[in-house]
Curated annotation (Swiss-Prot):
The gene is Mark2. This is Serine/threonine-protein kinase MARK2. Inhibited by hymenialdisine. Activated by phosphorylation on Thr-208 by STK11/LKB1 and TAOK1. Inhibited by phosphorylation at Ser-212 or Thr-539. Inhibited by PAK5; inhibition is independent of the kinase activity of PAK5. Autophosphorylated. Phosphorylated at Thr-208 by STK11/LKB1 in complex with STE20-related adapter-alpha (STRADA) pseudo kinase and CAB39. Phosphorylation at Thr-208 by TAOK1 activates the kinase activity, leading to phosphorylation and detachment of MAPT/TAU from microtubules. Phosphorylation at Ser-212 by GSK3-beta (GSK3B) inhibits the kinase activity. Phosphorylation by CaMK1 promotes activity and is required to promote neurite outgrowth. It is a peripheral membrane protein. It comes from Rattus norvegicus (Rat). The lineage of its organism: Eukaryota, Metazoa, Chordata, Craniata, Vertebrata. Residues 323-362 form the UBA domain. Residues 27-45, 417-431, 464-483, 492-505 have a biased composition (Polar residues).
Length: 722
């Protein structure tokens, strides 16, 4: 395989040719069998192993996919492993999946989730990506409400830098929205979900109409062809408005109403929005796509650079890869790798275990860990090959230089195609902007070798616990590619005067009904007009089976019967007109009842269980983890951890919540009725706050809608007497 990265071939949007593994072919690694053969049988440890990874827990699931939190055995680094069942996908979906993987391999930006390794067998594809412990921007807004402009600017500079980087590589994302913006442990942005991304060439129009309706450009609603970048620019305008106002500029009770508002291009300007921010919005939200600003122009905008006058935002320059770091090379040699195979894997960009190990060694998982690395010798081939199914094909591996690499698992679990990611942290130089972030099982991630983020610092508020999903799973192919959305006829051909910006925003004291507030930052929400599993949030795709014209007048969240019976994984109580596959696997399909086993195992307060006397003693002597996470004064205390756990259990019981003790100071909690919109699962953990003589309660959502989680989490937090 050539050491140079080959350009991605342009794909016909409507091509449905069955992809062969030749699309991603590469020379088999000498380690391939080892990766697939190492499993739980090879270790005395009861936790399952995949290759060089120990699977810790499921952090996301969907109809055809699971995402697992895993630990790289050789370096101790945590990774996210997405397991995709290819047998559930048709040829068109497979083609899009492989295109997504190829595109992610060429992206190396500190604010884009990094794909680290790809393993392919005959039936399953495993993607190993960064693990974003901070959850989605969507969840952050639900928990905290709108951002102050300083904080929004910090996030938005990172978003624009990453999207402009994609555009300069002639890649368009096409599904930018708050749900696809992740936060790492330091609250830096990571753009995820390249399932609808594609290459573009100016002059050759794209004609696939996809995206999430509130973020979709007007030309998509009109069924017009487009170059590519201009649809991302419109979506960025919606994102900016959402960050600053906590609401959407365009919304409606059904798709028809939403479409009409987008095509009018009118939105309200809240009284608290600065004039500079309002002027910047006018460069994004222009009905005529040819008149929208380019991201290079937007980088020079006044609002974008307030507080950064000496550091104007500029296009990101990708650093040269570092394939000859003597420290990492020597460490790998001590593990049993040879210098030749290390160089071959890196230069050939193979995305194999060798490259993954090298890249993982380049990063420390947490500032709290420092640079200490616990290294283990490489498993012998004899040990790991005994039960290895030989994969008939392998995915090409080509990695950019400095990502935190992680490997994927080869366990036969259902999976959904998507290129999701998990976030590597970019460096923030402004100490006053640091804040405790929510940490879901992994400590704050930090990057040693990755170039610093385009943003020197992030301002952050200390408020209520952030509902973090920890796994942002995107769904590229699994977004119902077979479920219709906007077809040109059904959307109609409303005419818009070209060359005329009809936005004419009006200032009003509060957001208008068309701009539904996501949440307020105080107290439990009284409204649920920013739900996750409804059509207004769902990503749509041309060529889906259901006809929009039959649904345009239905309220969001009401789904007509599917003529094909092809409803894949709805996230809301009753699903949505568009398959909610881009939202993420973390949201379980609430139409399907929770498995009996799952509910029955969540008995209240199961402590300790069986085990040896030694294990029980270790359990009793365990101490809370020292973590950085989003906390508030209501959930911190100088009480002893055991007293805090008793208080938490008391409040959970009072609110009819089931709980199960997973670790000494961590409870898995469930509230609501399986199969209903109020059903939610989350973790509550008593943690020690670093550098403070206080303990705090960490909340982390596992599944369920953002609003359902916020309702119960806020109620419990308010009732805790800590």
């Amino acid at each position: 395989m050539s050491s140079a990265r080959t350009p991605l071939p342009t794909l016909n949007e409507r091509d449905t040719e069955q992809p062969t593994l030749g699309h991603l072919d590469s020379k088999p690694s000498s380690k391939s069998n080892m990766l697939r053969g190492r499993n739980s049988a090879t270790s005395a440890d009861e936790q399952p192993h995949i290759g060089n990874y120990r699977l810790l827990k499921t952090i996301g699931k969907g109809n055809f996919a699971k995402v697992k939190l895993a630990r790289h055995i050789l370096t101790g680094k945590e990774v996210a492993v997405k397991i995709i069942d290819k047998t559930q996908l048709n040829s068109s979906s497979l083609q899009k999946l492989f295109r997504e993987v190829r595109i992610m391999k060429v992206l190396n930006h500190p604010n884009i989730v990094k794909l680290f390794e790809v393993i392919e067998t005959e039936k399953t594809l495993y993607l190993v990506m960064e693990y974003a412990s901070g959850g989605e921007v969507f969840d952050y807004l639900v928990a905290h409400g709108r951002m102050k402009e300083k904080e929004a600017r910090a996030k938005f500079r990172q978003i624009v830098s990453a999207v402009q980087y994609c555009h300069q590589k002639f890649i368009v994302h096409r599904d930018l929205k708050a749900e696809n913006l992740l936060l790492d442990a330091d609250m830096n942005i990571k753009i995820a979900d390249f399932g609808f991304s594609n290459e573009f060439t100016f002059g050759n129009k794209l004609d696939t109409f996809c995206g999430s309706p509130p973020y979709a450009a007007p030309e998509l609603f009109q069924g017009k062809k487009y170059d590519g970048p201009e649809v991302d620019v419109w979506s960025l305008g919606v994102i900016l408005y959402t960050l600053v106002s906590g609401s959407l500029p365009f919304d409606g009770q059904n798709l028809k109403e939403l479409r009409e508002r987008v095509l009018r291009g009118k939105y309200r300007i809240p009284f608290y929005m600065s004039t500079d921010c309002e002027n910047l919005l006018k460069k994004f939200l222009i009905l005529n796509p040819s008149k929208r600003g380019t991201l290079e122009q937007i980088m020079k905008d006044r609002w974008m650079n307030v507080g950064h006058e000496d550091d104007e935002l500029k296009p990101y320059v990708e650093p040269l890869p570092d394939y000859k770091d003597p420290r990492r090379t020597e460490l790998m040699v001590s593990m049993g790798y040879t210098r030749e195979e290390i160089q071959d894997s890196l230069v050939g960009q193979r995305y194999n275990e060798v490259m993954a190990t090298y890249l993982l060694l380049g990063y420390k998982s947490s500032e709290l860990e420092g640079d200490t690395i616990t290294l283990k010798p490489r498993p012998s081939a004899d040990l790991t090959n005994s039960s290895a199914p030989s994969p008939s094909h392998k995915v090409q591996r080509s990695v950019s230089a400095n990502p935190k690499q992680r490997r994927s698992s080869d366990q036969a679990v259902p999976a959904i195609p998507t290129s999701n990611s998990y976030s590597k942290k970019t460096q923030s130089n402004n100490a006053e902007n640091k804040r405790p972030e929510e940490e879901t099982g992994r400590k704050a991630s930090s990057t040693a070798k990755v170039p610093a983020s385009p943003l020197p610092g992030l301002d952050r508020k200390k408020t209520t616990p952030t509902p973090s999903t920890n796994s942002v799973l995107s769904t590229s192919t699994n977004r119902s590619r077979n479920s219709p959305l906007l077809d040109r006829a059904s959307l109609g051909q409303a005419s818009i005067q070209n060359g005329k910006d009809s936005t004419a925003p009006q200032r009003v004291p509060v957001a208008s009904p068309s701009a539904h507030n996501i949440s307020s930052s105080s107290g439990a929400p009284d409204r649920t007009n920013f739900p996750r599993g409804v059509s207004s949030r769902s990503t749509f795709h041309a060529g889906q089976l259901r006809q929009v014209r039959d649904q345009q007048n239905l309220p969001f969240g009401v789904t007509p019967a599917s003529p094909s019976g092809h409803s894949q994984g709805r996230r809301g109580a009753s699903g949505s007109i568009f398959s909610k596959f881009t939202s993420k696997f973390v949201r379980r399909n609430l139409n399907e009842p929770e498995s009996k086993d799952r509910v029955e195992t969540l008995r209240p307060h199961v402590v300790g269980g069986g085990g040896t006397d030694k294990e029980k003693e270790e359990f009793r002597e365990a101490k809370p983890r020292s973590l950085r996470f989003t906390w508030s004064m209501k959930t911190t205390s100088s009480m002893e951890p055991n007293e805090m756990m008793r208080e938490i259990r008391k409040v959970l019981d009072a609110n009819s919540c089931q709980s199960e003790l997973h670790e000494r100071y961590m409870l898995l909690c469930v509230h609501g009725t399986p199969g209903h919109e109020n059903f939610v699962q989350w973790e509550m953990e008593v943690c020690k706050l670093p550098r403070l003589s206080l303990n705090g309660v960490r909340f982390k959502r596992i599944s369920g809608t953002s609003m359902a989680f916020k309702n119960i989490a806020s109620k419990i937090a308010n009732e805790l007497k800590l």
